[in-house]
Amino acid sequence: MARHRAPKSAANDNRGTAGRESDATECQHAEHGPLELSNLDFPAQFVVWALRAWVQAFKSGASFDAVTQHGFTRFGLQASALALDGAMTVLAASASRPIDIRCVHCRTLSPDEAILLDAVASAQDERHFMATVALRKTMPGTAARIALPHMADLARDLARAGMRLNSMAVRSMYMAAETDATPQARRWLH
């Protein structure tokens, strides 16, 4: 007797198991706002896609290369895929809270995706302390120090391939995400 299992949906830390058939449709029709993925340039969109693909592969147990359909290979970024895998493995093992990485179809950027983009952009600008500060918002300090070399390798490899993140645009998205994620009562010091 064969066991039948429902197909797994795309990875998304924000969703339960109910309504899996409509996940992609719901994500594609998310409300537009300042954290819209289309507001980012291609290198930043590529990094967000890679983060989301890594989470999808991690949750489904599939090969990261298979999930990305050899996307890194197409751009000659095999070393970047390894660096991303290293950083995300550290994050998955040590996250200090639930991390919001959306499904690959989602049109909006989560605050945590903005934090990771800020870390990559800071590393590309050789601002490693700021990259560590960003990483510490998702993981303990020791884990951030372990993840930093992987993030720096990813940033360097992307820059060598001509994929420099616009650090000002990423920073403004990060600030908007941080404002959206912070409850009104905690935004002001009294």
PLM ranges: what are they?
Residues M1-L117, A121-H190:
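Polar/charged low-complexity regulatory segments
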